[in-house]
Regions:
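Long, intrinsically disordered low-complexity tandem-repeat segments
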Residues: 87-111
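Active-site loops and adjacent core secondary-structure elements that bind or stabilize anionic groups
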Residues: 1-88, 112-184, 188
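C-terminal accessory domains/tails appended to large, multi-domain proteins
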Residues: 115-116, 141-322
Length: 322
């Protein structure tokens, strides 16, 4: 069984990932949704030829790490290995105006608070605030938060959570920079490969590394329909819209090992990269955060330990318009 706080750094061949590509999103990127099947097949064959030409030249990369975790309100509390400081996990991103490792105030957290499940020994931890729906997905349903799918610290038993990132060699795009058509083809294929890498990694995590679903036997189509146990919400997607959360992911994973660098807004370079969390709870499900109000914005900024106006920039598209 994969050990908690162990990292898995993976490199994949392009041919390993082709079965995991979700071509529906590729067609959507090309404006072919609803178009004749022949049009889709034509561009797919061009894409497969390009992928074949990459086989011996390029790869994709992934990092997965399993942590002990507990929820505290709408926050996730990640317990860090004792060697974190030497490994650079406790570095902050203050140069970007974001401080990630925190006991709530932007400083590395250590605690012996027995009442919330953090043991008497001084353990390092990282507080990872989540956002909660202010309007349910459907009438009668609860307002969801990803922290709902993690065992509360107050129960005295720790849960587990996975953290991951994937990327595609960024040099691919440069090769086609002088041809608009093939540049777009390379970019859309790279985006699909980053997602396909996450799909394949998630399968390996469920069945082997984390191993909470060792007997899973799903087709690729079933995986694309998300019929597996658990979820892998990605940063920047509907339930995790705050791209500055990538600074927290970086502190947990050291994303440069997968060739990923962050801009000052938390966007990943190369563009064809994915990062996020993996939950194993059988009832965990994907949801859209929707719009949040000024009250939650201010509370979230406080929990992140950053100025409200800075956080407003990251969550602009998720705010209720006045």
């Amino acid at each position: 069984m994969f050990k908690v706080q162990s990292s898995k750094l993976k490199t994949y061949r392009i041919s390993e990932l082709i079965p995991f590509i979700n071509w529906l999103y590729f067609y959507h990127a090309w404006g072919l949704s609803g178009k004749p099947k022949a049009d889709k097949e034509k561009i797919k064959q061009e894409a497969l030829q390009m992928l074949a030409s990459w086989e011996e030249k390029y790869h994709t990369h992934a990092i997965f790490k399993l942590f002990e975790v507990g929820s505290e309100g709408d926050d996730l509390i990640f317990f860090l290995p004792s060697t974190s400081e030497e490994n650079g996990i406790l570095g902050t991103s203050e140069e970007n105006g974001i401080s990630g490792t925190s006991g709530g105030n932007g400083t590395p957290g250590t605690s012996g608070i027995e009442s919330n499940g953090i043991e008497e020994k001084k353990e390092k931890y990282l507080r990872f605030p989540m956002l909660r729906q202010q309007h349910p997905s459907a009438p009668g349903e609860p307002n969801l938060c990803l922290a709902d799918f993690i065992r509360p610290l107050s129960q005295g038993i720790r849960d587990q959570i996975g953290v991951f990132c994937t990327s595609v060699d960024g040099t691919i795009i440069d090769v086609y920079r002088h041809d608009d058509y093939f540049n777009m083809m390379a970019q859309t294929l790279s985006d699909r490969l980053a997602e396909a890498t996450a799909e394949k990694l998630h399968e390996e995590v469920r069945k082997e590394y984390w191993g909470y679903a060792p007997d899973e036997n799903l087709t690729i189509e079933q995986q694309h329909r998300e019929e597996y146990q658990g979820i892998r919400p990605a940063i920047g997607y509907p339930s995790l819209p705050d791209t500055s959360a990538n600074f927290l992911i970086d502190q947990l994973l050291d994303m440069k090992q997968a060739g990923i660098r962050l801009t000052e807004t938390g966007m990943m370079t190369p563009h064809a990269s994915v990062s996020g969390l993996m939950f194993s709870h059988p009832k965990a499900r994907y949801f859209e955060l929707g719009k949040i109000g000024e009250d939650q914005l201010r509370d979230y900024a406080r929990r992140r330990g950053v100025p409200v106006e800075l956080m407003r920039r990251f969550l602009q598209s998720s705010l209720i318009k006045k």
